[in-house]
UniProtKB/Swiss-Prot annotation:
InterPro entries linked: HcaT, HcaT-like, MFS_assoc_dom, MFS_trans_sf
Protein name (Swiss-Prot/TrEMBL): Probable 3-phenylpropionic acid transporter
NCBIfam families: 2A0127, mfs, PRK11128.1
Superkingdom of the organism of origin: Bacteria
Topology of this chain in the membrane: Multi-pass membrane protein
Record GO terms (molecular function): lactose binding; lactose:proton symporter activity
GO cellular component: plasma membrane
UniProt similarity note: Belongs to the major facilitator superfamily. Phenyl propionate permease (PPP) (TC 2.A.1.27) family.
CDD domains according to UniProt: MFS_MFSD6
Keywords per UniProt: Cell inner membrane, Cell membrane, Membrane, Symport, Transmembrane, Transmembrane helix, Transport
Gene name per UniProt: hcaT
Role this protein plays: Probable permease involved in the uptake of 3-phenylpropionic acid.
Residue ranges that the UniProt entry lists as topological domain Periplasmic: 32-37, 97-100, 154-156, 231-234, 290-292, 355-357
Length: 388
């Protein structure tokens, strides 16, 4: 069966982000159901972020031609489903489970940058509307969190791996569809300049400060990603209610992205980063002390400020840089914010959480506050004016 590129990519994002919407909030709950403690969970999930970083870079580097992208997505999806199914067989052997989680994180993480590479290829090739396709991915994340989160509340946390296996199998099957227009290679005009290294990019003081600031802001979400579900269920909030809390946060993110250009086109990147950092400080400072469901529900709306505003700001910064730098700057952003730093902060959170869940989130607030000291003071949308 053949489908148009827009629908092929939309279905691919649907499968990937629906499974990710179950894995991110609920996999720690599955580990807890297998009798692993909070400190061990923090270590395992923190290590998984390192594997995600390494896997994303490794598998992406293997793609040499555009027509390899879809084949890679199919193989990575199949491997993800097989490894997830195998986790149920090794759940009670820590080291085998650790290896399985590392392998899963490596192969599954590559689906995100490779999928975005396919979107970029089709965007240049046929004018694909990436924004609309990516919104389907965000909506799929909500579907995974809310619908399948509710199912988890019914069947129990011990069956999370089987729900994930089913979703990843669906993701694998829809990858087998054939696009009507295959992705094709094109040689960029500035390809001869596209040899700048990561270290060379970070030698730019402005880029270094922006990347560190964004890494601190995004990294401060570490405890939220790993322990929010565990914490909320420990204070009497049901798994199905927890899924609603995750869902409303992502919904707020989608709404902000939809209106972001209208809201922020005249606001400098520096101000946006200050707004996001301040929101993180406030959100993490109080989240561990609120036990009322509806107050937490309202607090979750701040995800639009703590995550979406920061993401919008860094993407806008990257678009102002030379074309030959953009791909590697995206890699630095994802590697630092969603890999190395969040892995470190997750491991630290795992050591604090058994003693005090509230202080775990307060520590995240302190991390976000540190961003204030590195955010460039005057960095607007299109031109670097001044930094101190």
């Amino acid at each position: 069966m053949q489908v148009r590129p827009f629908y092929w990519l939309a279905l691919s994002f649907l499968g990937y982000y629906c499974a990710y919407g179950v894995f991110l909030p609920f996999f720690p709950a599955w580990l807890k159901s297998q009798q692993y403690g909070e400190e061990m969970i923090g270590l395992v999930i923190g290590s998984a972020y390192i594997f995600r970083f390494a896997g994303g870079l490794f598998f992406s580097s293997l793609i040499k031609k555009a027509n390899h992208i879809i084949i890679a997505l199919r193989l990575l999806a199949l491997a993800s489903a097989i490894i997830m199914a195998a986790m149920s067989l090794v759940a009670h052997n820590f080291w085998l489970l650790f290896i399985a989680i590392g392998l899963y994180a490596s192969v599954n993480s590559a689906g995100m940058p490779i999928g975005d590479s396919l979107a970029s290829t089709w965007q240049r090739q046929i004018g694909l509307d990436y924004g609309k396709v990516r919104l389907i991915g965000s909506a799929a994340f909500i579907l995974g969190v809310v619908v399948f989160g509710g199912m988890i509340g019914w069947v129990g946390e011990q069956n999370i791996v089987w729900i994930l296996t089913a979703l990843l199998s669906f993701y694998t099957i829809i990858q087998l569809l054939k696009p009507t227009i295959p992705p094709k290679d094109e040689i960029p005009e500035d390809s001869v300049q596209n040899d700048v290294g990561f270290i060379a990019l970070l030698k730019n003081p402005m880029t270094l400060r922006v990347m560190i600031a964004v890494g601190l802001i995004q990294g401060s979400h570490a405890a939220y990603y790993v322990y929010s579900t565990i914490y909320w269920t420990s204070i009497g909030i049901s798994v199905s209610q927890t899924s609603l809390l995750w869902g409303i946060g992502v919904l707020a993110e989608i709404v902000l992205f939809f209106f972001s250009r209208r809201l922020f086109q005249n606001i400098s990147i520096s101000v946006l980063l200050y707004i996001s950092a301040l929101a993180c400080v406030g959100r993490w400072a109080v989240i561990g002390y609120i036990e009322d469901f509806w107050l937490i529900f309202l607090l979750q709306l701040m995800h639009s400020l703590t995550y979406a505003v920061c993401h919008y700001a860094i993407v806008r910064y990257i678009t102002t840089q030379p074309q030959s730098h953009i791909a590697k700057l995206q890699g630095l952003y994802n590697g630092l914010s969603n890999g190395v730093l969040i892995a470190i902060f997750t491991a630290i959170a795992g050591m604090i959480y058994p003693t005090s869940p509230a202080m775990t989130f307060v520590f995240m607030s302190i991390i976000a506050a540190a961003a204030f000291f590195v955010i460039p003071r005057k960095l607007n949308a299109f031109l670097i004016v001044q930094h101190k």
